[in-house]
Swiss-Prot record:
Descriptive protein name: Serine/threonine-protein kinase kin-29
One term of GO molecular function: histone deacetylase inhibitor activity
Processing and modification events after translation: Autophosphorylated. Elevated cAMP levels appears to act via PKA to directly or indirectly phosphorylate multiple sites on kin-29 and inhibit function.
Residue positions of the active site: 138 (proton acceptor)
């Protein structure tokens, strides 16, 4: 046996034949292996202990301690811990479907019913960990595997830790895209609340197909996370969007707990079968490791007998190792692997423990005299076959060993889809699922049967098919009681002489396809639905009217925001209708560029302009009130343009009315004086100095300057004239203390407020408000450790306020010779 093992490249570690690597990390390598006695595939994580420092050694021992105490159906189960020289081996459950991340890369976002199933299983596992006082701290799609029947399995407890009560953690760990804001800021944090944030990011990825805070650097990620803005796509339901926002809350105290997650209404939108399965799952989860040991006190005698025959272990050794949960003993691992195999076989409906032979009503089932023999513990043939055969992952000995050393493209650690583009949402396609229900992608190939073999089978009888579908008038319908007398049409007396091919004896001819693991990827990995539909017979052409399409669309997507009936394809793009429609509808004469939106463009098309001018000329030609009002308006506007009527220093001009904020942005219109807010002006200017010039916001005003255009309420003095700013090289606190001392000397009362600016970066800011209408704001400049001081005058004409600002600025210049003006 040594020569074949060397030829196949298998390495022996304990009772395992170790094969190819399926994953690699900084200090560890994961390989696929096969247990000799249980004949089950497992995953072995090998770590070189000599290459680890003291901190990583502590984390490794903590991981070993955690995997020994956890046992949950949606957490990868560990079987054995082996220490050989400088190597540490962790034997765990093997999941053949790969990572959830690779599934999302291949198929894109999933439907909410699929996301609900996966997220519920993840939430149940996290709830179990938190009940044990364990925090994962590295929840992400790469650390979630898909097992049998697409069940979730959480892996990688390298960053996990124990947490009790209100204890806070300080270690920064995890992946930045999934990290909570308190971790990004380097503060002490609650590990359980950090897991909830990671779960919120995970759910967003499942339903949206992307990250909630996309960025290409850690600094940009911090700014995006600390802004608190989560943009959820329109196709996400209202309940799911609310659920995501409740988990992605910046304040950990207001963030959801795992109990709130399990009780959210989105988690309970499912049918009765799924509700019963979820309830049974939560009830079956043990709340502590003590209950796990109590459930395992009774051992399976069949497994013990099998282990005594194949492992040469005594009954006492098996009982001590299993009840003591000795992970460093091969006895415990062997028993657990065999017990899992028996459990899977029972759940899959393998039948009774002793299958019946014959019939209870047979005449041969009477009593018989049998000589009594001494009772000896034996293993039935069914149980022996169940334990001795390979697991569902291993077909046979040869196939298992060859799979361990498989170097085909499908066995590599790379993704199956090299384009890495999001495909059709998983769970939404109906026809595609019928063709993608196998793990391997199917490609075109030659037929299984040759033309000579196909010629040996008689052609199907068209007369028989016609008779089965539409019986002739000469044959009356057969009664229900006599239908079983003629199971095949060939047995009918009327068709006894007609040759009929027995299709049940023919070999099943598969489709023209083959596995992509052969190395010839002739077709893309994702099934092209359009090619399949092109081969189907064309249905009769019938084009629905616009009203019918509108009703159908609103019935499906009427609950979404910004949904408007009968929007033209020119606005939203999409697929144009290749065949024109000739139905008479109320919408056929509508202008093509017309749309119903508050963000409509102020410009008009040529068709609309001509139509409006035509209506205007027709209205002026008739001698009615419209003509008289038009002449009066022209006279008033002409008189106002020539005469200057002053009122408190402001010119009374014809106001320019802006319909939308987008129109203000295009014409660069400044806000009026009545809505002047010195606090907002100071925050904007302070952020421009601290973080540079910012682009124009969605409100519509430019970020640095204002236009000369004004409204009737705006004064002759601009906003920039009422705002003065300087930059001091003194520390932030000294500037605040100096300003407060100066105001106290002048006996001017003031009120102080402390604020934090979170966008685009967390910045500290203090504001001093004076009764005379002066607002003094001081902000921190993080890179240079300087202070940005800004004075804003609310009163338009107040010499006292200007004099006070000049005195305070002179005071700051005296104590700081290196000041600079803005």
């Amino acid at each position: 046996m040594a020569a074949p093992r060397r030829r196949m490249g298998l390495e022996k570690i304990g009772l395992y034949d170790v094969g190819r690597a399926i994953g690699k990390g900084n200090f560890a390598t994961v390989r696929i292996a096969r247990h000799k006695i249980a004949k089950t595939k497992v995953a072995i994580k090998s770590i070189d202990v000599s290459a680890l420092d003291r901190e990583n050694l502590i984390k490794l021992e903590r991981e070993v301690k955690i995997v020994k105490v956890i046992d949950h159906p949606h957490i990868v189960k560990s079987y054995e811990i082996m220490r050989v020289d400088n190597m540490l081996y962790i034997v765990s459950e093997y999941c053949s479907s790969g990572e959830l991340y690779e599934t999302l890369i291949e198929k894109g976002r999933v439907a909410e019913n699929v996301a609900r199933k996966w997220f519920s299983e993840t939430a149940s596992a996290v709830a179990y960990l938190h009940s044990q006082g364990i925090v994962h701290r590295d929840l992400k799609a790469e650390n979630i595997l898909l097992g049998k029947n697409s069940n979730i399995k959480i892996i990688d407890f390298g960053f996990s830790n124990f947490q009790t009560g209100d204890q806070l953690l300080n270690t920064w760990c995890g992946s930045p895209p999934y990290a909570a804001p308190e971790l990004l800021l380097g503060n002490s944090y609650d590990g359980m609340k950090a897991d909830i944030w990671s779960m919120g990011v995970l759910l967003y990825i499942l339903v949206a197909g992307g990250f909630p805070f996309p960025s290409d650097s850690v600094n940009k990620l911090k700014r995006s996370v600390l802004s608190g803005l989560v943009k959820i796509p329109y196709w996400v339901s209202v309940e799911c969007a609310d659920f995501i926002r409740k988990m992605l809350v910046l304040n950990p105290g207001k963030r959801y707990t795992i109990q709130n997650v399990l009780q959210h209404r989105w988690m309970h939108i499912r049918d009765d079968v799924q509700k019963n399965q979820a309830a049974q799952l939560l009830e079956a989860i043990p709340s502590s490791s003590i209950e796990i040991r109590q459930q395992s006190t009774k051992l399976n005698p069949t497994i013990m007998m099998f282990m005594q025959q194949h492992g040469k272990w005594s009954e006492e050794q098996i009982i001590d190792a299993v009840l003591g949960r000795d992970f460093e003993s091969p006895i415990f691992a062997t028993y657990e692997l065999l017990a899992d195999k028996v459990k899977k076989g029972t759940l899959e409906g393998t039948g009774e423990e002793f299958p019946r032979r014959g019939s209870r009503g047979s005449i041969l089932s009477g009593k018989a005299n049998v000589d009594e023999q001494p009772l000896t513990p034996t293993i039935s043939a069914h149980q022996l076959a169940q334990l001795n055969l390979s697991s569902p992952d291993c077909d046979s000995d040869d196939s298992s060993n060859s799979d361990l050393c498989d170097d085909s493209p499908m066995s590599s650690m790379g993704p199956m889809n090299h384009e890495r583009q999001f495909g059709t949402p998983h769970g939404l396609d109906i026809i595609g699922n019928r063709f993608e229900n196998r793990r391997h992608t199917l490609c075109a190939s030659e037929q299984l049967l040759s033309p000579n073999m196909m010629g040996q089978f008689p052609p199907p009888n068209l007369l028989l098919n016609n008779f089965s579908m539409n019986p002739p008038l000469g044959f009356p319908p057969m009664p229900e009681g006599q239908a079983a007398e003629f199971p095949l049409p060939s047995l009918h007396p009327a068709f006894a002489t007609i040759p009929i091919a027995d299709l049940s004896k023919m070999l099943p001819v598969p489709k023209s396809e083959r596995r992509a693991s052969a190395g010839e990827t002739l077709l893309p990995t994702n099934f092209d639905l359009t090619q399949h539909l092109a081969n189907l017979p064309a249905p009769p052409i019938s084009f629905p009217t616009v009203e019918e399409e509108g009703k159908s669309y609103l019935s499906k997507y009427g609950g979404k925001r910004n949904t408007v009936h009968c929007l033209g394809n020119q606005l939203g793009g999409g697929i144009q209708n290749p065949i024109p429609r000739y139905q008479r509808t109320p919408y056929t004469k509508a202008p093509p560029a017309e749309r119903r939106s508050s963000w409509a463009s102020p410009s008009l098309s040529a068709q609309q302009q001509n139509h409006l001018e035509k209506l205007f000329k027709q209205a002026l030609q008739t001698n009615n009130d419209m003509t008289r009002l038009h002449k009066e308006f022209k006279g008033l506007s002409h008189g106002c343009a020539q005469s200057q009527i002053t009122n408190e220093g402001s010119s009374l001009a014809c106001p320019q009315i802006s319909i939308t904020d987008e129109y203000n942005r295009q014409h660069n219109i400044a806000p009026s004086a009545s809505s002047f807010d010195p606090v907002s002006i100071f925050q904007k200017n302070a952020q421009e100095v601290v973080f540079g010039q910012r682009p124009a916001t969605a409100i519509g005003f430019s970020s640095t300057s204002f236009s000369g255009m004004s409204t009737p309420e705006q004064t002759t003095r601009s906003i920039d004239d009422r705002v003065r700013s300087i930059v001091c090289t003194l520390p932030f606190t000294e500037v605040i203390d100096e300003l407060k001392a100066s105001l106290n000397i002048l006996k001017i009362p003031f009120s102080e407020s402390h604020e934090m600016v979170y966008e685009p970066q967390v910045t500290e800011m203090r504001r001093l408000s004076l009764p005379s209408g002066v607002e003094i704001g001081v902000a921190v400049l993080p890179p240079e450790h300087k202070a940005h001081v800004e004075f804003a005058i609310i009163n338009n004409d107040s010499p006292t306020s200007e004099y006070l600002c000049d005195q305070l600025i002179c005071r700051l210049r005296m104590i700081d010779p290196s000041w600079s003006s803005e």
